[in-house]
Regions:
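Conserved coupling/switch loops of ABC nucleotide-binding domains, chiefly the family-specific signature
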Residues: 90-93, 143, 243, 381
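The feature captures the beta-strand-to-loop junction immediately N-terminal to the Walker
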Residues: 69-71
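ABC ATPase nucleotide-binding domains
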Residues: 106-263
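ABC ATPase nucleotide-binding domain
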Residues: 37, 59, 95, 373-375
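Non-catalytic connector elements of ABC transporters
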Residues: 271-273, 280-394
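Conserved ABC transporter NBD signature motif
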Residues: 92-100
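Helix-to-loop junction immediately C-terminal to a conserved catalytic motif
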Residues: 84
């Protein structure tokens, strides 16, 4: 299951949606279907012993929108550049469709890239920028103009074709950069943090337009971002990387509900999942006096008195009475956001205190400094190995 992008982030200004909110039909475009395969692909930079990308195995289906996400230095942009032919592959292979492109130059890979920097020629009009690559390929002026007009109509840029880039907004410039890629009719779109230069409001509307465009064209797309919200709202699947290693490749919903390890659990979700240290007992995992039920098979595998990490998302908590089984929390602050509120509190004592976040009913928030008990929905509690960080619960 993928998260509904266009339906949940629909904007009246989106030129890719009709008045009913459905995608407008695409005419005049003939994109070739293509899979993308990373086959144990590695990249080691000269002078470094540690791979920037370490044996990446990833299969991307025809027409799929795949997002690579992770913190700075995780290898996501390097992975994209390996596919583009801008980085050498030291081991393994990369294929587009059935063709091994590992050693092909970028111009022979039939891909188109959109960067964080739009790289538009300031002295050229929008139409000239969009058609420049076709001009370099020797495409006739008549054919170029036809493709440019079709792409401009697709992107809502028709009235801007005669303008220079300096007369456009950041979002419009980004659409021009996308139009320049579209007119080439490549097999694969590669996008490297294309929204990083936009303000917060424009990023939301532009990411909706990009996702809607990709679904209309049906072109295989690999998209890189450090923003997990972008990843979750745009991708059919999301590949999470850390230190050059693939941590999990799954649908946005599965990443959220069943993270493979502690890193994915803490990285995906806003606010982040609460990760608490616990100790295995006969009854479950004891977290500061709050006993979390544990599956018998998992408990026997860990053994009595073993350490474990318990993960609980903020929305899984509820405030309970002092007589119930719950986690004692001292309220530090409550952020009221209308229908919901977030409680930021402290658990533990002295130097071992840890911050915890819970989503609560905004109509009955506790006061700062109050002591409350929080309990979690047992079906939404995650348990991870304290030694490896791997997920233990189903």
């Amino acid at each position: 299951m993928t998260l509904p992008v266009a339906s949940c982030e629909r904007h009246a200004s989106n030129p890719l949606l009709g008045s009913s909110g459905t995608f407008l039909p695409v005419k005049g475009w003939s994109f070739f279907m293509a899979t993308v395969t990373y086959d144990s692909a590695s990249r080691i930079y000269p002078g470094s012993d540690k791979p920037a990308v370490d044996k990446l195995d990833l299969d991307i289906a025809d027409g799929e929108f795949m997002v690579l996400v992770g913190p700075s230095g995780c290898g996501k942009s390097t992975s994209l550049r390996m596919l583009a032919g801008l980085e050498e592959i030291n081991d393994g292979a990369v294929r587009i469709g059935d063709r091994d492109v590992t050693h092909l130059p970028p111009k022979d890979r039939d891909i188109a890239m959109v960067f964080q920097n739009y790289a538009l020629y300031p002295h050229m009009s929008v139409a000239e920028n969009m058609g420049f690559a076709l001009k370099m390929q020797g495409v006739s002026k008549e054919q170029r103009l036809q493709k440019v007009r079709e792409a401009a109509q697709l992107l809502g840029l028709e009235e801007f074709l005669d303008r220079k880039p300096k007369a456009l907004s950041g979002g419009q410039r980004q659409r021009v950069a996308m139009g320049r890629a579209i007119v080439r009719e490549p097999k694969v779109f590669l996008m490297d943090e294309p929204l990083s230069n936009l303000d917060a409001k424009l990023r939301v509307s532009t990411r909706t337009q990009i996702a809607a465009l990709q679904r209309r064209l049906g072109i295989t797309t690999v998209y890189v971002t450090h923003d997990q919200t972008e990843a979750m709202t745009m991708g059919d699947r999301v590949a999470v990387l850390k230190d050059g290693l693939l941590q999990q490749n799954d649908t946005p919903l599965n990443l959220y509900d069943k993270p493979n390890n502690v890193f994915v659990a803490g990285f995906i979700g806003s606010p982040a999942m609460n990760l608490l240290d616990g100790k295995v007992t006969e009854s479950g995992v004891d977290v500061g006096g709050y006993v979390v039920p544990l599956q018998p098979a998992v408990r026997s595998r860990l053994g009595q008195d073993a350490a474990a990490t318990v993960g609980i998302r903020p929305e899984a908590f509820r405030i309970v009475s002092n007589e119930e089984n719950g986690l004692p929390v001292e309220v530090a602050v409550v952020e009221e956001l209308g229908a919901d509120a977030y409680l930021y509190g402290l658990v533990g004592n002295g130097d071992e205190q840890k911050e915890i976040i819970a989503r609560i009913d905004a109509r009955r928030p506790p006061e700062k400094g109050a002591k409350v008990k929080l309990a979690a929905d047992t079906e939404r509690i995650h348990v991870f190995s304290a030694s490896t960080g791997d997920r233990l619960t189903d």
